[in-house]
A protein has these predicted regions:
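N-terminal, polar/Ser/Thr-rich
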Residues: 21-58
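An acidic, Ser/Thr-enriched
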Residues: 93-99, 103-133, 137, 141-265, ...
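Von Willebrand factor
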Residues: 257-351, 356, 381-383
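VWA/integrin I-like adhesion module and closely mimicked acidic/polar interface patches used
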Residues: 352-401, 409-412
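Alpha-solenoid helical repeat scaffolds
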Residues: 710-714, 744-748, 778-782, 798, ...
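Intrinsic-disorder/low-complexity signal
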Residues: 829-969
Length: 969
């Protein structure tokens, strides 16, 4: 949808410390301001009320934030609240106002949540979705915000507090309430606590305050007095008991001895421009001063690691290295794990925001004596979970740079404590949380079979000590959630390898994370339709009805597979027939309409396959953009109704069945593709000057076009024209950095990588697309084709088969047969033979072809048609799906993406013209123009198979383009 206007509400920026704060300052990056975005709003949506309820016990804070938004506009809106959280904060709950009552959200896989939200919002009912985006950024989507009405939402945030001085430091997340017309604070701390200054003083453990958002200070922080002694709590919850041990430990002020050679992994990707280089250099100044003399092995990380360079450090002087870092221009995607460890390097510093957008997710193997420290200055845009998981699993720590560089240096130069745990039987999944280690605390989490299991701990090579006696807690959900949060942190060291485990954990404990979101639906029918188990009152009825639904679904799956097998048999009948290769007879009377009937093959298989049709009239010319969508739809409906009603009566049989398969064409088949070059104003400007300086000219233009995907596509094409492939791939990879949650952009990136003959790079991109949304069969097909092209045919079978067997929305009808063509071709041509035991044997016959053309495109809600004109002058298209000589066109895709396929088993000699007819798009395009991808194949399914692929970007209007030609001699 194209919006004419977008209003945003700035809720608050955390910019200062309050005068009444009574605790030492703890330096940690502050969150930036939340934004409420209401597209198409003429007046800004108002935050009417905010209620913040906070409670602290044993160093753990839980805050419940209830917000009421009012829409003063005369139209229904969708609202999107974007907000960051500080490092260590975790969302543990979300609720949405449904018919006046707050209904708790339930966890769902992230891609599933997005799919369900968008489908339900299109029906105009009440979903709410909370998801994590980049780093520690979150997005809450609410629909509808009624015209002239209000909606309430509630967030629950949990965090372990930092210890400083003589107590726990509690900072209230006021940023959510600052813009509210009315605010209420209700806080509870241990009963003996008194802290802070009026009017925000906690007395006897309580604080109640009412007022306006404008009266709130920029930040409220209290120091809650607490004894520095070990405390152990155990509580039951669901499947077991959960333990939290808070252990004071000694910290050393003596810096550790640095090795004489260190490795510096410097993130030079496009997102590096948002880091604070001044803070990073200030930290490195002190680090190299402590190092004195030594060597630095520098590796700049982008879409691929640049060649390593070595620099000498003399008496702390690192000016040469500093100049090299200053010369790094941010560009390309972030392949943070794609580098080679050097045996001589004993310590690595990774300076990055942790937002891995490219390549593998598991770090290279480090030797036991090699450490990794991670450093970020990107604030809330940091993926602190990943960086902490990587560094702590490799003997180092994560340092989030704040305003106090001396504190950050002390943390970087101190040695992480060696902590060992001796757990008895019945103790599972012990996790050590080191986030407060610099303040002299360790938090130990574990899952227990019972509450009396003994455990011992040894810190820093000291004596083994038994944990103190446990205190029984009544808040099992809180302790279990903290354990799950720490366990997720541990698994994040290999996020891709542990994705399923992380998703199960997040769903079990209701945590929002990289792969799990929280969703609220309006009706029980919605929960049943999407197989999402609700919370609260709806759960019992859901469980009873869902058991019946499961049995029905299994029967429907079997029926669907039978239907696909029947349609595949019909295609075999078409393939086994011989078709005339002479000049077609002149059409007489109304028989001309037969070839134009827009009927599906499966509706009249035998008659259709037995009868080659006369030559069809020319396909209609493209319509004007202003009329195209409505007229295309109605014209197709009229054409289908009038022609298909007559089809069976008017067919004259001129072809015959053959007992043996017809022979494929043995002659020469050539392909000639139409040339295409980017012709934007920027592309024309960049072409001027020497080719050797093209990349430099691009860098000079980059900042001005950083939000334009079309810019990066144009530049990549120009670099490929000049033979600068590696730089072209770098520029192309910027699409992965632009919008981390935009699968449409990633799909375009994957297609362009395939066109550039880089399928190994395309595979992880298409894996990301699939992880973001499994509701579109193209996501499975794209991954399967990329795996096959990357030399992984066995792995390619699974996603291709999913296209065949899964139920899809009706707008994707026909894609199953196209994927089956690709799957059976892969099986037939692979050596050694593939394992096909999981595939229905009815679906395994391969059908080689002389000619195959497949058209797909990168925009949803857009219509494009494949036209193939043969030597008879007959055009195969959506209205003429079966030609006189047996050319077959697949079903028409009018809703987006495609694919559409033309197949011809035995090609008549002559020229075949391939065109794409674009009807236009009904949505705002991520690249500013629709991109078509057309694959032309000769001798499909044989040893002589030859593929060529062309990509073109079309203007956002109706047009017909010549893509290429086949010639059969």
């Amino acid at each position: 949808m194209v919006f004419a206007r977008c209003c945003t509400v700035l809720l608050l920026a955390l910019v200062a410390w309050p005068a009444g704060a009574q605790s030492p300052r703890i330096s940690r990056p502050q969150a930036t301001m939340p934004l409420l975005i209401a597209p198409a709003a003429e007046q800004p949506v108002q935050l009417q009320r905010a209620r913040i309820e906070g409670e602290v016990q044993a160093g753990i804070a839980q805050t419940r934030i209830t917000l009421e938004f009012h829409n003063p506009n005369r139209r229904v809106l969708e609202g999107e609240l974007q907000f960051p959280l500080a490092d260590g904060q975790q969302i543990s709950g979300f609720a949405l106002d449904i018919n006046g009552e707050l209904r708790d959200a339930v966890p769902v896989p992230k891609d599933r949540g997005r799919q369900v939200f968008e489908e339900i919002a299109r029906r105009g009912v009440d979903p709410g979705l909370l998801e994590q985006t980049a780093g520690n950024q979150f997005r809450l989507r609410i629909y509808p915000l009624p015209a002239g009405g209000s909606r309430r939402v509630q967030l629950v945030i949990r965090e372990p507090l930092a210890f400083a001085g003589q107590g726990w430091q509690w900072t209230l997340p006021l940023q959510f309430a600052a813009g509210a017309a009315a605010v209420e604070l209700e806080l509870q701390a241990p009963a003996t606590t008194s802290a802070g200054a009026a009017p925000f003083r906690i007395n006897a453990g309580r604080l109640h305050w009412q007022g306006k958002g404008a009266q709130l200070p920029a930040q409220l922080q209290w120091s809650l007095p607490a004894a520095r002694q070990a405390q152990v709590q155990v509580a039951p919850w669901q499947d077991g008991h959960y333990l939290l041990a808070q252990l004071p430990v000694s910290t050393s002020s003596t810096p550790r001895t640095l090795p004489s050679e260190i490795g510096l992994l410097w993130d030079g990707s496009g997102s590096a421009g948002q880091r604070n280089r001044t803070r990073e250099f200030a930290l490195l100044d002190r680090y190299f001063a402590a190092m004195g003399d030594g060597t630095v092995a520098l590796t700049v990380l982008r879409d691929r690691a640049e060649p390593m360079r070595r620099f000498r450090i003399r008496a702390g002087n690192w000016s040469e290295l500093r100049a090299a870092l200053q010369a790094v221009r941010p560009d390309g995607a972030s392949a943070l794990a794609q580098w080679q460890a050097q045996p001589s390097v004993k310590e690595y510093l990774l300076v990055s925001d942790g937002l891995l957008t490219y390549g593998p997710e598991q770090l290279p193997t480090l030797a036991p004596d090699q450490r990794l420290f991670a450093i970020s200055s990107a604030g809330a845009r940091t993926d602190s979970t990943r960086l902490r998981g990587w560094s702590e699993s490799h003997g180092g720590r994560f340092v989030a740079l704040g305003k106090d560089v001396e504190s950050d240096v002390r943390e970087l130069l101190s040695s992480p404590l060696d902590v060992q745990v001796d757990a008895g039987r019945g103790v599972q999944d012990v996790v050590i949380d080191r986030r407060s280690e610099a303040q002299g605390w360790l938090w130990l989490h574990a899952r227990l079979a019972a509450d009396g299991v003994p455990m011992r701990v040894r810190v820093g090579g000291g004596e083994w000590e038994a944990l103190p006696a446990t205190q029984k807690s009544n808040d099992g959900e809180l302790l279990a959630g903290l354990w799950a949060q720490a366990r997720l942190q541990q698994l994040a060291a290999d996020r891709r390898g542990n994705r399923e485990a992380m998703q199960r954990l997040s769903q079990q404990f209701g945590l929002v994370g990289p792969d799990t979101s929280l969703i609220v639906l309006e009706t029980l029918e919605d929960y049943l339709r999407y197989a999402i188990r609700p919370s609260g009152k709806l759960r019992a009825e859901y469980d009873a009805r869902f058991a019946v639904q499961l049995a029905d679904r299994a029967a429907a799956d079997r029926q669907r597979l039978d239907e696909v097998a029947a349609r595949w048999k019909e295609r075999q009948q078409w393939w086994n027939r011989s078709w005339p290769k002479d000049t077609p007879p002149q059409a007489k009377g109304r028989a001309l309409e037969v070839a134009s009937a827009d009927y599906a093959m499966e509706s009249a298989p035998v008659a259709m396959l037995a009868a080659p049709a006369p030559a069809a009239p020319p396909a209609p010319a493209p319509m004007a953009a202003a009329e195209q969508h409505m007229e295309a739809s109605s014209a197709r409906s009229r054409r289908s109704a009038s022609a298909s009603n007559k089809a069976l009566d008017l067919i004259t049989v001129t072809g015959g069945r053959v007992a043996t398969p017809a022979a494929a064409n043995e002659g020469e088949l050539g392909i000639q593709l139409a040339a295409w070059q980017p012709d934007s104003a920027v592309a024309r400007r960049l072409r001027q000057g020497p080719a050797s300086q093209l990349y430099d000219r691009y860098l000079a233009e980059r900042d001005a076009h950083a939000d334009s995907s079309a810019f990066f596509l144009d530049v990549a094409d120009l670099l490929l024209e000049q033979g600068q492939r590696e730089l072209a791939l770098r520029v192309l990879s910027n699409l992965a950095e632009m919008d981390l949650d935009n699968r449409h952009l990633l799909r375009v990136l994957g297609y362009r990588l395939m066109q550039a003959d880089a399928p190994a790079l395309a595979v992880p991109v298409f894996e990301q697309v699939l992880a973001m949304g499994q509701e579109e069969p193209q996501s499975f097909r794209d991954l399967g084709l990329a795996l096959a092209a990357a030399g992984k045919p066995q792995q390619a079978l699974a996603p291709l088969y999913q296209v065949v067997v899964r139920p899809w929305d009706s707008r994707f009808d026909g894609i199953a047969l196209i994927a089956l063509d690709e799957l059976t071709n892969l099986v037939a041509r692979s050596t050694p033979r593939l394992d096909t035991r999981s595939i229905d044997p009815r679906l395994l016959q391969a059908m080689p072809l002389d000619l195959r053309v497949v058209l797909s495109w990168d925009a949803d809600n857009s219509d494009m048609d494949l036209w193939v004109t043969d030597p008879n002058g007959e055009r195969a298209y959506y209205g003429n799906r079966l030609t006189y000589q047996g050319g077959q066109m697949s079903q028409d895709f009018t809703g987006g993406y495609g694919p559409e396929q033309f197949s011809l088993r035995n090609a008549k000699p002559g020229k075949y013209k391939v065109e794409a007819n674009y009807f236009g798009s009904r949505q705002q395009l991520v690249t500013g123009a629709t991109t078509l991808m057309l694959r032309l194949t000769t001798h499909w399914g044989t040893a002589k198979q030859k593929d060529q692929m062309v990509t073109m970007r079309l203007k956002d209007r109706a047009e017909t383009v010549l893509v290429g030609e086949f010639e059969v001699r």
